[in-house]
């Protein structure tokens, strides 16, 4: 039987809001919201006779209220854990603003009783343009300084009096201002030179030749200068040895130490060196048989889902039961080589809950060292002068230079004719020696293309016998007759009957192995 699900009851506040208007609220809800329970009544009636306010009871602060703990028979209490109040003298603030300008000559205001007609003066009179002193009268109105009376508050009570003393002459604050004017006639020119050196704001001294100077020391000495070779010269330069690091800064982080401890810990991680080149290019083909996917990236962590109960033989025995193979990690060995490492996880056992248990394996392979190539002297491509040989096949015959003037006018016609017997068998003989050391032996009909087999040349005094098998046609083999011994195969026979005569009679008994075996029957 299924157990009924317990529904959550609404809060007291929600019930009070819904039932107060209709007047159907339970008494406990009304007393709870309106604070009319038994505990509330005890607090109300008890607070009439006893007052504990301001003591901070049951607040958890431990400060004794706003007045602190007061020992018996002593003065005011001390607040626990609070810093003492520091009384500082008050400083009269000053108003920061523009300074007061003192007028040089103020304009006299117009008197209301003065006439409204202004008398004009004759401007045709000659103005005084001669230089002279201009008298300036400045009226300074002193600022009245009254004695400032400071009212000190009067504090009365049973406690000690605390006086707030204020300095009558506060310290005067000085203000320093700086004004900068822009001069349009002055122009600053900043320029930089491409020369290598250091320039300081000190004065530079320039020495010019021909201005007449005094020679100090011996006569001048001519020094032969050498020209520095540029990088565009055609000289062969020795290659610079490769640098191990570009910046001598060692940055060792906690992650690197943890990773190195996980890879090279022989107690927790199995070390396996892989020599197959597929480990760098496509390591998944070493774990299981599959097709190549050109879209998949082998540089990420690979997870192989398989059934532990199923027996699957991987292409490489070192990757047996591999469930997870991490991404490649490039490190440097002590010999200076680059090592490619991958951290794998085996799934050798499986529990009933589905958890798989296996050891961690560190697969690594070292990349071979790439030696620096030897420098090769290069030649310029272009026209150059030199001897060249041109061979033409039609003119490979021998050419004789014969002087025509030395030929006699009459030729001797009495030339003995060579008698040749064309019926002789010597003409059929071929004196040429054939060499079949680089020949090819073709077996089969010539109407179709067949693979060619090259017969190598052996430096041996013995006769060379080459056996060639033709798998496309019929092969007839005529073996030599040899006398072979006749092999008599044993015929199968039953068990031998063993007789053991005990008397002179012909009685016998069967061997225990020949007796019929009794079948065991199961009785219910």
From Swiss-Prot:
<dbReference type="GO" id="GO:0044174">
    <property type="term" value="C:host cell endosome"/>
</dbReference>
<keyword id="KW-1177">Microtubular inwards viral transport</keyword>
<dbReference type="GO" id="GO:0043657">
    <property type="term" value="C:host cell"/>
</dbReference>
<dbReference type="GO" id="GO:0042025">
    <property type="term" value="C:host cell nucleus"/>
</dbReference>
<dbReference type="GO" id="GO:0044177">
    <property type="term" value="C:host cell Golgi apparatus"/>
</dbReference>
<keyword id="KW-1048">Host nucleus</keyword>
<keyword id="KW-0426">Late protein</keyword>
<keyword id="KW-1040">Host Golgi apparatus</keyword>
<feature type="short sequence motif" description="Nuclear localization signal">
    <location>
        <begin position="516"/>
        <end position="523"/>
    </location>
</feature>
<keyword id="KW-0238">DNA-binding</keyword>
<comment type="subunit">
    <text>Interacts with major capsid protein L1. Interacts with E2; this interaction inhibits E2 transcriptional activity but not the DNA replication function E2. Interacts with host GADD45GIP1. Interacts with host HSPA8; this interaction is required for L2 nuclear translocation. Interacts with host importins KPNB2 and KPNB3. Forms a complex with importin alpha2-beta1 heterodimers via interaction with the importin alpha2 adapter. Interacts with host DYNLT1; this interaction is essential for virus intracellular transport during entry.</text>
</comment>
<feature type="short sequence motif" description="Nuclear localization signal">
    <location>
        <begin position="1"/>
        <end position="10"/>
    </location>
</feature>
<dbReference type="GO" id="GO:0075732">
    <property type="term" value="P:viral penetration into host nucleus"/>
</dbReference>
<comment type="function">
    <text>Minor protein of the capsid that localizes along the inner surface of the virion, within the central cavities beneath the L1 pentamers. Plays a role in capsid stabilization through interaction with the major capsid protein L1. Once the virion enters the host cell, L2 escorts the genomic DNA into the nucleus by promoting escape from the endosomal compartments and traffic through the host Golgi network.</text>
</comment>
<dbReference type="GO" id="GO:0075521">
    <property type="term" value="P:microtubule-dependent intracellular transport of viral material towards nucleus"/>
</dbReference>
<dbReference type="GO" id="GO:0019028">
    <property type="term" value="C:viral capsid"/>
</dbReference>
<feature type="disulfide bond">
    <location>
        <begin position="19"/>
        <end position="25"/>
    </location>
</feature>
<keyword id="KW-0167">Capsid protein</keyword>
<dbReference type="Pfam" id="PF00513">
    <property type="entry name" value="Late_protein_L2"/>
</dbReference>
<keyword id="KW-1163">Viral penetration into host nucleus</keyword>
<keyword id="KW-1160">Virus entry into host cell</keyword>
<keyword id="KW-1039">Host endosome</keyword>
<comment type="similarity">
    <text>Belongs to the papillomaviridae L2 protein family.</text>
</comment>
<keyword id="KW-1015">Disulfide bond</keyword>
<protein>
    <recommendedName>
        <fullName>Minor capsid protein L2</fullName>
    </recommendedName>
</protein>
<keyword id="KW-0945">Host-virus interaction</keyword>
<keyword id="KW-0597">Phosphoprotein</keyword>
<keyword id="KW-1176">Cytoplasmic inwards viral transport</keyword>
<keyword id="KW-0946">Virion</keyword>
<dbReference type="InterPro" id="IPR000784">
    <property type="entry name" value="Late_L2"/>
</dbReference>
<dbReference type="GO" id="GO:0046718">
    <property type="term" value="P:symbiont entry into host cell"/>
</dbReference>
<dbReference type="GO" id="GO:0005198">
    <property type="term" value="F:structural molecule activity"/>
</dbReference>
<dbReference type="GO" id="GO:0003677">
    <property type="term" value="F:DNA binding"/>
</dbReference>
